[in-house]
């Protein structure tokens, strides 16, 4: 996992595998939007909250609470990148789960962009 003390890039939250880092990005976005709405925060430049998530991590319930909070607060500066590698400490993630997950994200009005294959993934971040 990323470390604020060991990595040279900006890493705001170092967390474990229980979905906390994913949820933190949503709530940090809400806080950032609140600060921006105040007179003392209007000059602040908005950042992006990005979480790298394993598909097995989507078993955690707090992630779905964060999805709903994102919908209720119309978040636009929060990105979740889900690595659908079907690996888990407990076993293998079921095939076909990603289609169900996409429907859940759609239901909460999150934009879903599916990127497959290394070349396309690299192009998404150029």
Regions found by a protein language model. Give the residues of each.
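Glycine-rich ThDP/TPP pyrophosphate-binding loop and its adjacent helix/strand module
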Residues: 7, 11-126
């Amino acid at each position: 996992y990323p470390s604020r003390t060991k990595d040279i890039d900006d890493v705001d939250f170092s967390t474990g595998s229980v979905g906390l880092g994913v949820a933190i990005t949503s709530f940090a976005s809400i806080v950032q939007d609140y600060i921006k709405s105040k007179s003392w925060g209007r000059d602040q430049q908005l950042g992006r909250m990005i979480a790298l998530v394993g598909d097995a991590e989507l078993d955690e319930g707090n992630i779905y609470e964060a999805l709903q909070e994102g919908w209720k607060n119309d978040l636009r500066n929060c990105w979740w990148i889900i690595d659908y590698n079907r690996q888990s400490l407990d076993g293998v993630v079921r095939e076909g789960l990603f289609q169900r997950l996409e429907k859940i994200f759609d239901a909460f009005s999150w934009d879903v962009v599916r990127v497959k294959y290394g070349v396309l993934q690299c192009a998404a971040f150029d």
